[in-house]
């Protein structure tokens, strides 16, 4: 069951993101929380693989729950933004909502921000200047500061990457 759920989630995420050059990010998030964080809960790892399906694809919560169960769906909902809102509102709400997320969702959020900050440092979008990259690091740090403290190794890695990013952007 453990491996089946994770493999099924990988396949589902790949299918849902098939029109996007994107599947590497969800895999990176799941790998980060498993490898660095020592997380082996199949529902958390499956949710990490699926964490952007509600935001970035046509997936509905009912579909996730039917395929992967209530807990996986709850984790994904907990880390998903409401894409109907303007970007600034979504960013502000993500900072505020981080205080209320479950421990499982906090693990996924840490893995997500580690992956995203690493990309912003090493492979930023072409149209992001240094100020935009610094703003992203500041925002990501606020989100993680508000998350429940759940895993020292992931939290330390996030802080190391933020520090590396700030040094690189001087």
What is each PLM-predicted segment?
Residues 1-170:
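Active-site helical microenvironments for divalent-metal-assisted chemistry
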